[in-house]
């Protein structure tokens, strides 16, 4: 039986980016220590953790030592090699579960899983060859979106296809990998629900947020989202069903398209989520604390929203707006401490309370 952790226990986190950083800060508020495992030097999370191991995920000796030094392991990103998980599981528990990771790592498995639960996704075809791409295009038509099945995030690993697209060139440009072709969804807007489930099966969902993306990267999340009461209820119930079906422990982010009043699931992420950052200033207990509570075996906290919020990411050189934001007393600023400013890189975010 999974144990309940007491304050003073150590939580291991795979990945040292901003999500790991904010998980560490939430853990510290509850009296936990954290230990970060991350390949890169000086990641954001290392500045707020009590332990840091810099090593690759195929360094099994370092992984074993890391796992044996903590009481539970969680992660800030989903593309973790299977071999690393094998090593860790011999030493301690991992939350969320490997089943959730397995499904979320593969867009084809993810779509099939969602459809099996009875929920809608974009239409799709598996593509494993140039000929398969031609067949898929004949079935789904254009416009459509061709994506790698694995390792895609923030708009990477995908390309929009039109009537004049050359299947041979497109197939080669994506590295001749296993792909999935998704039919185009004509949606009015995008939303997401951040849900959580505890070890004893308690489920709590934050209010849906309305998301705006540019170049495949989340720019803003506004809460409350533009939804009918029924749509809001449906989005939360769908998220709860996914949590239950996976016997999930921790926080999950489920993204939806709203198309002709219909909710179509885009994808889910088995971790804390960028579109949930608004909870840091809009709720008593935010997504990061909720995740720590869940994996520690604690009861979930009160995630009820107490104000309307707009969250905006600071991307690339938008970090240069920092001085103006510091002078603006109406915003709560969250900076990640990243040194290198790169196009498309998330450098921080801010929450503006609008009511």
Question: For each of these PLM feature ranges, what is it?
Answer:
Residues 32, 50, 92-93, 119-122, ...:
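A structural micro-motif
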Residues 173-227, 232-265, 269-277, 289-302, ...:
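Phosphate-binding core of ATP-grasp and ATP-grasp-like enzymes
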Residues 280-281:
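A conserved FAD-binding loop/helix module that cradles the flavin
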Residues 305-314:
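Short glycine-/aliphatic-rich beta-strand segments at the starts of folded cytosolic domains
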Residues 313, 318-321:
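Extracellular/lumenal mucin-like low-complexity stalks
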């Amino acid at each position: 039986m999974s144990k309940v952790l007491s304050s003073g226990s150590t939580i291991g986190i795979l990945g040292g980016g901003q999500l790991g950083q904010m998980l560490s800060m939430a853990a510290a508020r509850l009296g936990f220590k954290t230990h970060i495992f991350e390949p890169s030097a000086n990641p954001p999370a290392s500045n707020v953790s009590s332990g840091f191991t810099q090593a690759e995920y195929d360094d099994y000796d370092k992984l074993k030592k890391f796992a044996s030094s903590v009481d539970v392991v969680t992660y800030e990103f989903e593309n973790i090699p299977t071999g690393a998980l094998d090593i860790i599981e011999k030493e301690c528990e991992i939350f969320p579960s490997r089943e959730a990771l397995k499904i979320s790592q593969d867009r084809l498995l993810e779509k099939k899983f969602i459809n099996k639960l009875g929920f809608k996704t974009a239409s799709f075809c598996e593509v494993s060859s140039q000929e398969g791409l031609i067949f898929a295009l004949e079935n789904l038509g254009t416009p459509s979106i061709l994506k790698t099945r694995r390792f895609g995030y923030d708009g990477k690993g995908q390309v929009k296809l039109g009537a004049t697209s050359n299947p041979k060139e497109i197939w080669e440009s994506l590295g001749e990998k296993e792909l999935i072709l998704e039919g185009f969804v004509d949606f009015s807007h995008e939303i997401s629900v951040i849900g959580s489930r505890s070890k004893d099966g308690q489920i709590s969902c934050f209010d849906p947020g309305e998301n705006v993306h540019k170049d495949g990267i989340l720019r803003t999340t506004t809460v409350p989202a533009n939804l009918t009461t029924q749509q809001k209820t449906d989005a939360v119930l769908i998220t709860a069903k996914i949590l239950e079906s996976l016997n999930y422990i921790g926080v999950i982010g489920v993204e939806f398209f709203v198309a002709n009043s219909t909710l179509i699931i885009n994808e889910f992420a088995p971790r804390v989520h960028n579109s949930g950052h608004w909870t840091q200033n809009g709720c008593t207990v935010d997504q990061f604390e909720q995740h720590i509570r869940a994996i520690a075996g604690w009861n979930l906290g009160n995630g009820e929203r107490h104000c309307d919020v707009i969250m905006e990411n600071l991307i690339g050189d938008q970090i240069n707006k920092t001085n103006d934001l510091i002078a603006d007393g109406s915003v709560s600023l969250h900076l990640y401490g990243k040194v290198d400013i790169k196009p498309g890189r998330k450098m921080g975010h801010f929450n503006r309370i609008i009511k």
